[in-house]
Regions:
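A short glycine/serine-rich beta->alpha loop
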Residues: 10-15, 118-130, 217-221, 278-281, ...
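Short acidic, glycine/tyrosine-flanked loop/strand segments centered on an H-E-D-like triad
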Residues: 98-124, 308-326
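Glycine-rich, N-terminal phosphate-binding loop and its surrounding beta-alpha-beta segment
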Residues: 44-103, 107-109
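N-terminal, positively charged regions that mediate nucleic acid binding
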Residues: 1-58
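Alpha-helical support elements that line or immediately flank enzyme active sites
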Residues: 20-32, 128-150, 225-233, 289-291, ...
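Glycine-rich, mobile lid/loop segments that gate access to catalytic sites or pores
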Residues: 113-223
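Internal helix-turn-beta structural module
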Residues: 302-362
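Glycine-rich anion/phosphate-binding loop at the beta-strand->alpha-helix junction
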Residues: 14-20, 135, 201-204, 208-317
């Protein structure tokens, strides 16, 4: 399976939703960085299941165990491997799904690709559970970036038809917010939207907006090595993401050039733009302005309502009712996943520009 991000950093994610463990190996991290385990645990807890009535009832501690790559609490230059043990699985909930693919899930495409040998329990390697090891990698990258002054923060922009219209400038406005929105009234309506979907046996999607502040100009490259390319590749590794945009995104198509162009200016002796429709990237290269991106998440496909499917063994039409424990909306738990994906991409680009010697913490 294609579960390895290869750049100046190599991030390999392994495991299945109901396997004994899931994990990640990260190669290319600069040596000598002191990993703050308490901060990493708090970051992982934002993604962990079972912590809210808005999420799945499945509870997992998501406590990472580091097998190698650290010495005395610091990165040592060797590949870093960490695992999270799966302790609360109910694989029997998925027995009936081996022949009947769930609409909206990867069950059918996995069956075609892997000939029935795939692990179907909990979605196997296709599960959103695999975002936990992504958050281990991204959480460490975020700590490294923060010590260089680059800060990443994401917020819930919308859930269903409810949108937080408040402009998002960065992390300061989100301090202490358990539900990461800027407009608390809109946040309350979003939470009610999720609860209403759950009560109806249904689910709802949404959009997460992420801002990366204090990014050096000059990161990235044209065409295939572009900053948008790297970010999008990592964002689309989050299973429920169906769309990604940067800056004005698809809204730029409705503007004229005179509206979309960001004029240049000098501020405190450095070049800036007076707007940021470009989302901090021009020609695949960072401008020095904040990176602004949004990821659209589909509604969780596992719902309690009856759905039409087929029995792959008998080749007959059948009705499916999904059992098990599922999120009515994945968006609240996906906020740190978006931050993690952005962190890996930005640190990878910094390593390309400066090398490990130029990003030393010793």
């Amino acid at each position: 399976m294609s579960s390895v991000y290869t750049g100046n950093l190599t991030v390999a994610i392994f495991g299945q939703s109901h396997a004994p463990a899931i994990g990640v190996t990260i190669d290319g991290l600069p040596a000598g960085f002191p990993v703050d385990m308490d901060a990493l645990s708090r970051f992982l807890a934002r993604r962990a299941p079972g912590g809210s009535p808005l999420s799945t009832p499945r509870r997992e501690a998501d406590a990472p165990e580091f097998l190698c790559g650290l010495s005395g609490g610091r990165t040592c230059g060797a590949p870093l491997t960490a695992i999270i043990r799966n302790t609360n699985t109910r694989s029997q909930d998925y027995d009936a799904l081996r022949a009947v693919p769930r609409p909206g899930h990867a069950d059918y495409t996995a069956q075609i690709k892997y000939g029935g040998y795939q692990d179907a329990a909990g979605g196997g390697h296709f599960s959103g559970r695999l975002t936990a090891p992504l958050c281990i990698a991204g959480g460490i990258c975020m700590q490294m970036l923060a010590q260089k002054g680059t800060v990443i923060a994401a917020r819930i922009l919308s859930v269903g038809s409810v949108t937080d219209e408040t402009p998002f400038d960065g992390p300061a406005a989100l301090q202490g917010r358990a539900f990461p929105v800027l407009d608390e009234a809109a946040g309350a309506r979003m939470q009610q939207e999720i609860l209403n979907a759950r009560a109806a046996g249904d689910s709802v999607g949404g959009v997460i907006e992420c801002v990366v502040s204090s990014v050096p100009a000059g990161l990235g490259a044209p065409m295939f090595g572009g900053m948008e390319n790297r970010l999008a590749q990592l964002l689309f590794a989050i299973p429920a993401v169906k769309g990604v945009e940067f800056g004005a995104g698809f809204g730029a198509a409705r503007l004229r050039g005179s509206e979309n162009n960001d004029p240049f200016a000098i501020q405190n002796g450095r070049v800036v733009t007076t707007g940021n429709h470009a989302g901090g990237i021009l020609g695949g290269i960072t401008t020095g302005m904040p990176l602004v991106m949004r990821a659209a998440f589909k509604p969780t496909p596992s719902i309690a309502l009856p759905q039409q499917s087929v029995n792959l063994e008998t080749k007959t039409q059948t009705e499916l009712r999904v059992q098990g424990r599922h999120d009515p909306c994945i968006v609240p738990r996906a906020v740190p996943c978006v931050e993690a994906a952005a962190a890996v991409a930005v640190l990878d680009a910094m390593l390309e520009s400066y090398g490990t010697e130029g990003l030393s913490w010793t």
